[in-house]
């Protein structure tokens, strides 16, 4: 639920359907933050790694936004490629620090998504996602306005920078809370929002609930497949999501390049958004 909604908000704020926590350096930043917390304060509670993960993931996401706002080539594929390159740089730094401090085994569980470590006393931090999702619903109209551009937001009396940073903070907090508990799960924040947008348009008020529900069903399905394929052993959910997500991601890129800018927004609501505003 959290990853799907984070992806939907990031896509709206960045005005690009291929932006998500995995392609926007948010997840890799959270992983680096967790590693730093485990090295600096090794015997701390789950709140400390979550706090470190939030700060570093927010900085990584802001760096990503900084880069994409200053490049001239802003094609639908170029923006996520920049995010992927930035994510790989951060991941390389994470692996280097882990190797330097002999923490490779410790950080490995956070680099791969799995529900195996979800036990009592560890998963409770995910509850922080609930008020953040509620806040996302409250600010949905503001995110819609910011997604239309800085000048449009200014004309409607919305502080563009404040709403943009607030939206990125929500996405970073959600991502950090999830990565601390289950590790990295890619593609959920990328694929699920695009599917919903293709079916219902990109107005956040009408897509947040559907995105959350489809994200939950998708993750649950992948988890069941991971438990059934090689019973009695279990495949990590990140592996199953990665395989299915990679295929869907390539299909979306091809579809976008073939049909143009309206390919992923077949039912875009134009007049309704202006009326609501």
Question: Which residues make up each language-model segment?
Answer:
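Alpha-helical transmembrane segments in inner-membrane proteins
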Residues: 1-277
